[in-house]
Amino acid sequence: MNVRAALPPCSILLLAGGRGQRMGGRDKGLIEWQGKALIEHLHALTRPLTDDLIISCNRNIERYAQYADQLVKDDDTDFNGPLAGIRAALPRARHQWLLVLPCDGPLVDEPLLRAMREKAFEYPQRPVMVREGQHWQPLLCMIPVACAATLEAAWLAGERSPRRAMEPLQPVAVQLEANDPRLANLNTPCLLAGINENDRK
């Protein structure tokens, strides 16, 4: 069977609902990198892959609306982290899988997303999560929508870590080498400037 041709459709969630503390309170998804907002880079990558593009955002709703089929927001104003956005998106997803990406990772590429989808095809009942060396990257994951109840139970029990919330579901790894450049996380002004500078060399 041609696995690539058989890949089921997925909903895609771009996480842009954080407080932006490391960016001085700025909305990370709207910060420019290489002349475009970070969310615009992720939109260009993911738009061809889904008819259900969801953005989790808690401010600048009008700006984000142009990049999404759906917007979701946390059910409170406490900025409880990325699990809040995942929790809000899972019941709204139109497909059986939700592929999750952070807005501050613009170097993620299509081959990595394809590898995640192929792994999900092999393990349809379990979350798929990127692992860089020995470290899990829980915000680069695919979650079966059928697992929403487990994550909701973890949330109601006080869990706020996506990785720990998914542990009972036995995530399957997409294994990458340590320091894979595609996982560069531009979550501080210095990192953002450093990547821009390196790209000029």
Swiss-Prot record:
EC number annotated for this UniProt entry: 2.7.7.77
GO terms under cellular component: cytoplasm
Description of how the protein assembles with itself and partners: Monomer.
Major enzyme class: transferase
The protein's role, per its UniProt record: Transfers a GMP moiety from GTP to Mo-molybdopterin (Mo-MPT) cofactor (Moco or molybdenum cofactor) to form Mo-molybdopterin guanine dinucleotide (Mo-MGD) cofactor.
Catalytic reactions of this protein: Mo-molybdopterin + GTP + H(+) = Mo-molybdopterin guanine dinucleotide + diphosphate
Positions of GTP binding: 15-17, 28, 74, 104
Superkingdom of this protein's organism: Bacteria
Record-linked HAMAP family: MobA
Name the UniProt record assigns to this protein: Molybdenum cofactor guanylyltransferase
tRNA processing listed as a keyword: no
Residues reported in the UniProt entry to bind Mg(2+): 104
The organism's taxonomic lineage, starting at the top: Bacteria, Pseudomonadati, Pseudomonadota, Gammaproteobacteria, Pseudomonadales
The family this protein is said to belong to: Belongs to the MobA family.
UniProt cross-references to Gene3D superfamilies, sorted A to Z: Spore Coat Polysaccharide Biosynthesis Protein SpsA, Chain A (3.90.550.10)
GO molecular function, one term: GTP binding
